[in-house]
Structures are given as structure tokens and as C-alpha cells.
């Protein structure tokens, strides 16, 4: 089987190491900026269709401003872009939109980033009625244009999760417009090319007061952003995982397949134990047979054997990752055979390569896996051949380094 080679036009060092091509720091004259006007911002898309859940399925869209006098934030925030890790660095603005029990969302607005007021009896605080999403914005190599990666997929996933959690959710169009406004309002926080990305965090919460167990009478949709670098402290170096035997992330019929807030608090115990032992994160097994791979705490898992790529199938206990979905499509366009199926822990231990995917990690090679005291290593302290090829193509698409034939990116110009 012939596979497409790594794109020769892409400098892989640009993807694997911070770029020095955009090193000039532009200093902000003031942080107390007035919100830019977004009344004229429209979403243009080549085609759309109304989905069964009432949202609009966008195949491609571009954000443009029809008012040339609108003032957008163009300078970069005055921070050390070379040391940006994956921690919160509050930007200027957040987006807030309310919804009452009838399911209709009011017009959202940009507010200065800050604390919110919430009732002690809010549904999200008492019963965990909340969802979140995560996506990224990248500054293109020219330093001007900004790209969003598949925001409509996050919108659809939030709507699916909201249905499971008995919550109303913004339409796909409302979601994408809100993300667009928020990113443009915080444009100066989008890192220079090669220095990281702007992490976008949409939240949907039951903020109405309840006492008995019931859906909240009011909901709040919030988006905030933060510039980020690599998720794992290892950066793009391989991570070390431990397979968890005692704790489980999800059960059949539960909420493992949606991005509800409770799924993540539940993994903190096992993750803390693993990190105390020197591991990067935890790989979970299914809770019934305890032999099939599920996922890592915050990302999906892939194995490679004889150039065949395998990943656990989506069946309700694994989050349908957008990076996972994108990686599968990229791999197939590169000529690889990809299987979505039950993957055993024994296959993991015999794999040629192992890697993780997720919005936060993008693609992270796995250097070792420890299972019942047995440690198996992969590669030689760097990306494997297959994972490096896929990483190069995917990140090149995300950063606008190659033509987006997949129609995945949204150009904010």
C-alpha cells in the first residue's frame, strides 16, 4: 500500500519547535480597551443545512466585517510567548448568553473577563448540570489572519451533550458566531505563529436555582479564552502512561460519551496517583472485561501495528473527539488503513507506535505504557514515523500552512 509522503513544503521544525520567524514583540499601549463593535460581523458559508436538532450544519464559513471603521484589537499582548504553557492567562473579554426554561437564548454580549454571580442552589453546583467544549484558534504564518479549527463540530457535540443532560443549547450558528466574536475581541491574545494557540472554552451551565433534583430553570452559555502552549510538560516529547486497573472513567449507559463536567472530576484521583509516581497520565480500560482500551483522562488513544492504525470505537463510553475524528480522516487521505474497533491491552503492549489525540494535546506520542508493573517502551524518545507524518499534516491544516482541501478551517479576517 502506497502512502502519501510528508508534505515537502512544510518545515517540520516549524511544527515541532517554536518559530523564530515572528519574534518581534508588539507591546500593548493599554489593557483597558473598549469592546470592538461586532454588529457587522457575519458568518459566510458556502453551504448549510438545518439539522434534525434544529441547528445549522456549516460546511465552511468565514468571518468578515462589513464595517471597515470597526476597531479590532491588532497588537499582541505583552507576555513572554516563549514560556506559555497550558495554564490560564485571562484575556480581555468573555461572551455571555442566557436562556430561560422555554429554551430560547437571549442575545449574547461581550463582557470584561471576570467572576460571575451564581446562586448557591444553581443546578450546576448542586447536581452537576453542565457541559464544556474546547477548541483552538491559530495565527497564520503571515501574522494577520486567524484560523478556527472545525468550530461547528464543537457546536454539534455540545448540542448532543445538552440533550443527554436535559439542557437547551445554542444552535450551531449561534455557537460559531459567539466563538468568532470572542476570538476577535481577544485577538491580541492569539500567540504568534509557532508559539502556541488561543484555547477557546465554551461552557453551558444550569445556573437557575433548584432544590429538588430537576433540570434548572435558567441556563448560561459562556465563552472565555486563554493563550496556551503544550498541554503536557513533556511538550512534543513522548509521554508515559499507566494503565488503570482499579478506577474507571465511564460505564455503558452513562455519560462517558458527552463532555459533561462530572466526567473530568471523576478522573482526578487516578490521575493524581499516577502523576505522583512519575507518569504523565492514565489510560483507562472498559469497566466490564477490563481488557479493552477506552481513553486517556483528556484525550483519545491510537495504536499502530504494521502500518495499520487502530483506535477504540465510539459506543457511548468514549468521548467522540474532534481531533480523533480529524486524525482518522487525515490518516485515510494519507493512504493508511484505519480501524475503529475494540482494542485490547495486549495489542497495546505489542504495538509499533502509540499516540494520543485531543484539542489540548493535538497529537502526543506515547513513549511508554506500564501495565501491571510491566513497562513497554515505544520509539526512541521522539515521534514514530506514522504519528509524525499525521501530526505534520494535521497541524499544517490547523495553522494554514497547506491548502485546506478538507474545508475544516474558519478564516477570521
UniProtKB/Swiss-Prot annotation:
GO CC aspect terms: chloroplast; chloroplast stroma
Gene3D superfamilies in the cross-refs: 3.30.470.10, D-amino Acid Aminotransferase, subunit A, domain 2 (3.20.10.10)
Stretches of the chain forming a coiled coil according to its record: none
InterPro entries reported in the protein's UniProt record: Aminotrans_IV, Aminotrans_IV_CS, Aminotransferase-like, B_amino_transII, BCAT-like_C, BCAT-like_N, BCAT_family
GO process annotations (BP): isoleucine biosynthetic process; L-leucine biosynthetic process; L-valine biosynthetic process
Catalytic activity: L-leucine + 2-oxoglutarate = 4-methyl-2-oxopentanoate + L-glutamate; L-isoleucine + 2-oxoglutarate = (S)-3-methyl-2-oxopentanoate + L-glutamate; L-valine + 2-oxoglutarate = 3-methyl-2-oxobutanoate + L-glutamate; a 2-oxocarboxylate + L-methionine = 4-methylsulfanyl-2-oxobutanoate + an L-alpha-amino acid
Cofactor: pyridoxal 5'-phosphate
Gene disruption phenotype: No effect on the levels of free amino acids in seeds, but reduced levels of Val, Ser and Thr in leaves. Increased levels of Met-derived glucosinolates in leaves.
Pfam family, one: Aminotran_4
Protein's name according to its UniProt entry: Branched-chain-amino-acid aminotransferase 3, chloroplastic
Function (record text): Converts 2-oxo acids to branched-chain amino acids. Acts on leucine, isoleucine and valine. Also involved in methionine chain elongation cycle of aliphatic glucosinolate formation. Catalyzes the conversion of 5-methylthiopentyl-2-oxo and 6-methylthiohexyl-2-oxo acids to their respective Met derivatives, homomethionine and dihomo-methionine, respectively.
Tissue-level expression: Expressed in the phloem cells.
Pathway entry: Amino-acid biosynthesis; L-isoleucine biosynthesis; L-isoleucine from 2-oxobutanoate: step 4/4; Amino-acid biosynthesis; L-leucine biosynthesis; L-leucine from 3-methyl-2-oxobutanoate: step 4/4; Amino-acid biosynthesis; L-valine biosynthesis; L-valine from pyruvate: step 4/4
PROSITE patterns: AA_TRANSFER_CLASS_4 (PS00770)
UniProt keywords, alphabetically: Amino-acid biosynthesis, Aminotransferase, Branched-chain amino acid biosynthesis, Chloroplast, Plastid, Pyridoxal phosphate, Transferase, Transit peptide
Protein family (similarity comment): Belongs to the class-IV pyridoxal-phosphate-dependent aminotransferase family.
Example of a GO MF term: L-isoleucine-2-oxoglutarate transaminase activity
Entry's EC annotation: 2.6.1.42, 2.6.1.88
Transit peptide location on this chain: 1-60
Note: Branched-chain amino acids are synthesized in chloroplasts, whereas the degradation takes place in mitochondria.
Domain of life: Eukaryota
Induction info: Diurnally expressed.
Amino acid at each position: 500500500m502506497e502512502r502519501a509522503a510528508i508534505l515537502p513544503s512544510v518545515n517540520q521544525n516549524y511544527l515541532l519547535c517554536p518559530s523564530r520567524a515572528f519574534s518581534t514583540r508588539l507591546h500593548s499601549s493599554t489593557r483597558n480597551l473598549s469592546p470592538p463593535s461586532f454588529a457587522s460581523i457575519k458568518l459566510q458559508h458556502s453551504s448549510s443545512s438545518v439539522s434534525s436538532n434544529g441547528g445549522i450544519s456549516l460546511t465552511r464559513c468565514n468571518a468578515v466585517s462589513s464595517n471597515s471603521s470597526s476597531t479590532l484589537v491588532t497588537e499582541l499582548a505583552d507576555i513572554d510567548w516563549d514560556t506559555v504553557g497550558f495554564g490560564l492567562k485571562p484575556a480581555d473579554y468573555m461572551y455571555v448568553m442566557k436562556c430561560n426554561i422555554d429554551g430560547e437564548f437571549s442575545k449574547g454580549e461581550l463582557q470584561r473577563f471576570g467572576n460571575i454571580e451564581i446562586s448557591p442552589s444553581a443546578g450546576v453546583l448542586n447536581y452537576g448540570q453542565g457541559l464544556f467544549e474546547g477548541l483552538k484558534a491559530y495565527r497564520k504564518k503571515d501574522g494577520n489572519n486567524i484560523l478556527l479549527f472545525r468550530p461547528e463540530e464543537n457546536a454539534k457535540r455540545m448540542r448532543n451533550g445538552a440533550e443527554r443532560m436535559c439542557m437547551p443549547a445554542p444552535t450551531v450558528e449561534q455557537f460559531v458566531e459567539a466563538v468568532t466574536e470572542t476570538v476577535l475581541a481577544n485577538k491580541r491574545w492569539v500567540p504568534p505563529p509557532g508559539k502556541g494557540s488561543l484555547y477557546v472554552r465554551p461552557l453551558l451551565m444550569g445556573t437557575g436555582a433548584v432544590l429538588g433534583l430537576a433540570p434548572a430553570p435558567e441556563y448560561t452559555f459562556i465563552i472565555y479564552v486563554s493563550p496556551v502552549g503544550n498541554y503536557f510538560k513533556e511538550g512534543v516529547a513522548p509521554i508515559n502512561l499507566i494503565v488503570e486497573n482499579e478506577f474507571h472513567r465511564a460505564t455503558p449507559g452513562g455519560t462517558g460519551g458527552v463532555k459533561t463536567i462530572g466526567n473530568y472530576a471523576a478522573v482526578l484521583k487516578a490521575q493524581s496517583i499516577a502523576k505522583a509516581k512519575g507518569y504523565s497520565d492514565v489510560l483507562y480500560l472498559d469497566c466490564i472485561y477490563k481488557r479493552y482500551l477506552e481513553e486517556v483522562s483528556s484525550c483519545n488513544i491510537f495504536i499502530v501495528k504494521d502500518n495499520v492504525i487502530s483506535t477504540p470505537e465510539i459506543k457511548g463510553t468514549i468521548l467522540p473527539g474532534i481531533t480523533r475524528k480529524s486524525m482518522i480522516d487525515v490518516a485515510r487521505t494519507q493512504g493508511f488503513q484505519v480501524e475503529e474497533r475494540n482494542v485490547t491491552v495486549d495489542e497495546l503492549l505489542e504495538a509499533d507506535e502509540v499516540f494520543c489525540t485531543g484539542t489540548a494535546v493535538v497529537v502526543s506520542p506515547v513513549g511508554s505504557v506500564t501495565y501491571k508493573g510491566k513497562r513497554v517502551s515505544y520509539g526512541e524518545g521522539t515521534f514514530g514515523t506514522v504519528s509524525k507524518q499525521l501530526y505534520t499534516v494535521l497541524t499544517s491544516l490547523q495553522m494554514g500552512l497547506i491548502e485546506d482541501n478538507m474545508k475544516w478551517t474558519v478564516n477570521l479576517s
